[in-house]
């Protein structure tokens, strides 16, 4: 099998692909550098940052609407906001939009509830532009890696979940980008790689995202050997789309891939925005709660995390979307979301 044949969706009518129309409340983030295998050059990273900021900034106040730090203590502030939230209340706080439907509507009314990060061509992203890196000054190299980290952080803290269709090879920082999103999708034969060790530049930064999606030992093997793996062995990290057997055309695999992407985006775009945002913040926050022998319940942190998450569930239950969802369920009708 040639290398071209081995790339998933490689040369499968993806090169000239026109991105499908998105449902309402969804928007694209476009990684646009196909001539350079979608390498993350300084200019491309600046463009990704700009697109993210546009989709995360309140049109009304000009405020950047990102999730708060993943720190358990912030739940105290959210509880105070939730307890005093009322239709006629004028009291607000920095994060009131996470629990108050009125504040959400005021700040995020024109912003998307789901983002879709896509590139075109047979390679999703080959990572940093090594040719450019070699020509940059040390200060510019530091700027490139700092900008890369900022882009990943904006994705992680986006209230709108970020879906990432990985239509081709994802390596190094390109894999980091894909796995920093909330929901990545790939065909079973899609190749992933941390190739830096082969050129004396271990993929230390990309490994931070990968090791948070798959077991650390598996990540370290990829980091150490630089060997490529397929999505089929990374099912914990990616929604893997099986390629149809006995397909008469490679377009069949592309259709299965696009069908799954559309299904996921439609489902998320049809969901209430505020619960998804609060749920995302709570999920990543509780993962960082470890057992504390002195001021917690010790052990692996499960009991502390469960107790803390119960407080977030109470916030969910007080919210307008939860009340609407429960009412719709009991009345056997579709909910009319507030956010």
Question: PLM ranges: what are they?
Answer:
Residues 137-146:
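A short acidic, glycine-rich active-site loop
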Residues 1-118:
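Conserved CoA-thioester-binding segment of acyl-CoA-metabolizing enzymes
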Residues 226-233:
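Acidic, divalent-metal-coordinating active-site segment for phosphoryl/phosphodiester hydrolysis
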Residues 118, 158, 165-166:
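Structural motif
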Residues 151, 155, 165, 171-223, ...:
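CoA-thioester-processing core
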Residues 51, 103-107, 147-159:
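Catalytic-core regions built around general acid/base machinery
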Residues 185-190, 238-308, 314-320, 337-339:
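C-terminal long alpha-helix characteristic of the crotonase
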């Amino acid at each position: 099998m040639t290398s071209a044949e081995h790339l998933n969706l490689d040369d499968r009518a993806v090169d000239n692909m026109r991105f499908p129309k998105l449902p309402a409340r969804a928007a694209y983030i476009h990684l646009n550098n196909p001539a350079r295998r979608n390498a993350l050059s300084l200019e491309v990273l600046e463009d990704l940052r700009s697109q993210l900021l546009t989709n995360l900034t309140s049109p009304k106040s000009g405020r950047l609407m990102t999730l708060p730090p993943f720190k358990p203590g912030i739940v105290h502030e959210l509880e105070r906001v939730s307890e005093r939230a009322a239709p006629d209340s004028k009291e607000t706080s920095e994060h009131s939009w996470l629990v108050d439907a009125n504040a959400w509507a005021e700040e995020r009314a024109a912003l998307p509830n789901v983002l879709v990060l896509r590139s075109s061509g047979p390679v999703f992203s080959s990572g940093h532009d090594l040719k450019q890196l070699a020509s940059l000054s040390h200060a510019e190299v530091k700027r490139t890696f700092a900008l890369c980290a900022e882009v990943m952080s904006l994705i992680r803290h986006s209230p709108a979940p970020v879906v990432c269709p990985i239509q081709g090879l994802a390596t190094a920082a390109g894999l980091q980008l894909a796995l920093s999103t909330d929901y990545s999708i790939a065909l079973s034969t899609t190749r992933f790689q941390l190739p830096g060790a082969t050129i004396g530049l271990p993929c230390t930064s990309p490994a931070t995202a990968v090791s948070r999606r798959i077991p650390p030992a598996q990540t370290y093997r990829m980091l150490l050997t630089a060997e490529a793996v397929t999505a089929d062995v990374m099912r914990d990290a990616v929604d893997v789309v099986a390629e149809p057997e006995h397909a008469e055309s490679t377009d069949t695999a592309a259709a299965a891939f696009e069908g799954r992407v559309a299904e996921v985006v439609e489902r998320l775009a049809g969901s209430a925005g505020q619960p998804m945002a609060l749920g995302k913040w709570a999920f990543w926050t509780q993962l960082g709660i470890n057992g504390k022998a002195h001021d917690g319940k010790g052990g692996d942190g499960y009991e502390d995390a469960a107790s803390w998450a119960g407080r977030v569930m109470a916030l969910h239950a007080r919210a307008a979307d939860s009340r609407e969802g429960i009412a719709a369920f009991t009345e056997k009708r579709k909910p009319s979301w507030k956010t």
